[in-house]
């Protein structure tokens, strides 16, 4: 809904939801929300659907973590079916369906995207997974579309009349967010936003370049 508000108040900005944890959504509700935001924005909406990697998030919704792959497959099938049905009204503006990427970092993600003929959103450190996806798309007769934004591009921008003052006032909160988020990484899991580096100090946050404090243009 935040994307819908942004799109309603702009004319050229593209809103990218990256990413929504698909298995935690009711399929029909998600289809309705995406269709509405797509229409409000005149087709300027991009949604990446992922599984997530934190069991606690599934526990909060009472959803079995080990079922997330099956639930995602069911979700994608339901979304495509609803958006193509004349009985689903109001339908999305973008046809045959809104722009939906499948996001993740494992081979099952590539197989899922190729099977449904959907574009793939990967971390930049997994070129071999992009190649695997392209091979699968070629076998299935789909045109592969893959984006691999580097961690730095997945940052946050804060607007303040005095950017230096913003760092002074909000720096401890920037640091808390960065340390918690990067702390979720481990083993084969890498935070899409903060990568695998260690964040210990506010200087580390600034050096990473993924939080920007900027002065709004007049």
Kindly give the residue locations of the regions a language model identified.
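An alpha-helical appendage that flanks or caps ligand/catalytic pockets
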Residues: 61, 65-91, 125-218
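Internal, glycine-rich beta/alpha segment that forms the wall or movable "lid"
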Residues: 23-116, 121-136, 140-147
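Alpha-helix boundary recognition
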Residues: 7-8, 114, 171, 206
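N-terminal beta1-alpha1-beta2 module of alpha/beta enzyme domains
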Residues: 1-10, 14
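A short, GP-enriched loop/loop-strand-helix hinge that lies immediately N-terminal to
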Residues: 14-18, 47-50
